[in-house]
Amino acid sequence: MNSLVATPPVPPHFYEYSRLSSPHPMSTPTHTPTNRKRKADDDGNDHDGRMSASPTNSPAFTPRSLPAPRSFKRSRPNVSGRPLSLPRLLETLDTDALRGILRSMCERHPALADEVIHTSPRPSVSSALQVLRNYQSTLQNSFPLGGNPESDYAYNRVRQPLGNLLDALSDFTPHFLPPHETQASVSLSYLDGATDIIHALPRWHSPQNNIERDSAYDEICKAWILVIREAAKRGGGIQLQYGGWDQKLAKHNQNAGGRLQAAVNELGNSLGWMHGPDSQGYGSSTGGDLVSVREQLLSGTYGLGTPVKVGPW
């Protein structure tokens, strides 16, 4: 007997699931394993790819602005010679050349000389003495090598530089004298340095060759007298009292062989009123004691070393 096996009925919810699902089934990718071994080239290529790839989270690089190109002077198409400008020309000149050019211009244009005089700064004592020392150095270098430096031959060899020094001394000295110079300290400082330069003048065997040296002493002595008189009129001669000029002038007179004695006497007369009625004793022991007392009184130190008596008088 043939029996038919009935197929079990399909539940109704199965049909509903089939109806809602997509008619195209999703296919999952399958990885087919290969038996090929990895090579070193593959690893290197993979590593280079990873290193060359920029990360997605790396910050963006902002481009930097390049510096502006320097501007250079454009070369002239036609090269030709031309004279220097005035500033460049003056840079090539030394001091002597500038003095010569300025002197020549002042000689051709007298009005320019007055402008130069009023525009130039006032010469100082140090600058004037330096000029005199330069003339003195030139004089010393002009002496002939060997032989007698006091002979007539040596005098003839150095006559020109000696005259230049004495002329410069005669020109500079009135500039530092009153009334043109109002500061007594400036005048005294210049005379002190100028007298030292006269002391260094050469001595000659022939008396007639020493006339110029003696004349220089006479002129500087008159300058000392003029400055001392003007300084004594101002502030009671305070500049003469505390500058030690009495000792300096006495030393100059000694080096000059007594040719500045008139200036020493003038200084003694100017300071005589501080020594009492006996002004002739200036420079003696009594005069020195009075000067010491005067200095102590004016400086406020008089009587500091005297013991003070305590108790009934």
Curated annotation (Swiss-Prot):
Pfam families on file: Cut8
Compositionally skewed regions (Low complexity) per UniProt: 21-33
Annotated Basic and acidic residues bias: 39-50
GO BP: any one term: proteasome localization
Cellular component GO terms, alphabetical: cytoplasm; nuclear membrane
Subcellular location: Cytoplasm; Nucleus
Keywords: Cytoplasm, Nucleus, Protein transport, Transport
GO MF terms, alphabetically ordered: proteasome binding
Region span, Disordered: 16-84
Family in the record: Belongs to the cut8/STS1 family.
Quaternary state and interactors: Binds the proteasome.
Free-text function comment from the UniProt entry: Involved in ubiquitin-mediated protein degradation. Regulatory factor in the ubiquitin/proteasome pathway that controls the turnover of proteasome substrates. Targets proteasomes to the nucleus and facilitates the degradation of nuclear proteins.
Descriptive protein name: Tethering factor for nuclear proteasome sts1
Provenance organism: Neosartorya fischeri (strain ATCC 1020 / DSM 3700 / CBS 544.65 / FGSC A1164 / JCM 1740 / NRRL 181 / WB 181) (Aspergillus fischerianus)
